[in-house]
A protein has these predicted regions:
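A conserved regulatory-domain signal marking ACT and ACT-like small-molecule sensing domains
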Residues: 1-176
């Protein structure tokens, strides 16, 4: 049985250890994960596999104890067989965006990509203060497929309209 876990809490040393220990205690294997710190909060998304001797109820009880002991917030969802067997998309490009922070950057870039049927696989954004004001940085991993040229042209137009720098970097399949 595969379970999707979303876990968050105040950033501190030992969160990954605490979560991994709770999962190990019920023989759950962490198969896929993404973890990051965001402005004092630590967030984790994990797909775990329970062995045949563990139940979803045991997992829920272990996670409730983890929440009580650590103050973390945990959500869990059982995955369907189709979700478990889904083959993830492999990105073929990285898109970087940088410039003055303002509302609408994420929407404009994602709107261009969605309009070309380009799938976003991963996104990371940061807004930071600098001597020039708030600066915005975004990196997206995407699957452009046959739309690389059209995507580059549309993003160049969006770059001018937004007043930000947008670069597209093709990934070689051998480094994926």
């Amino acid at each position: 049985m595969h379970i999707l876990l979303s876990i968050s809490g105040h950033e501190r040393a030992g969160i990954v250890r605490d979560v991994a220990e709770s999962l190990l205690n019920i023989h759950a294997n962490i198969e896929d994960s993404s973890m990051t710190a965001l402005r004092g909060r630590f967030t984790m998304m994990l797909i775990v596999n329970l062995d045949a001797n563990s139940s979803f109820g045991e997992l829920k009880a272990s996670l409730a104890e983890l929440e009580q002991r650590t103050g973390l917030t945990v959500q869990s969802q059982q995955l369907s067989e189709d979700e478990v067997n889904h083959v993830p998309l492999e990105p073929d490009c990285v898109i970087t965006v940088s410039g003055a922070d303002k509302p609408g950057i994420v929407h404009a870039v994602s709107d261009v990509l969605a309009g070309l049927d380009v799938s976003i696989v991963d996104v990371s954004t940061q807004s930071r203060e600098s001597e020039q004001g708030n600066m915005y940085m975004m990196a997206l991993e995407a699957v452009s497929g046959e739309h690389m040229d059209a995507m580059q042209q549309a993003l160049a137009k969006a770059s001018k309209e937004l007043g930000v720098d947008i670069q597209v970097h093709a990934l070689e399949s051998s480094i994926l």
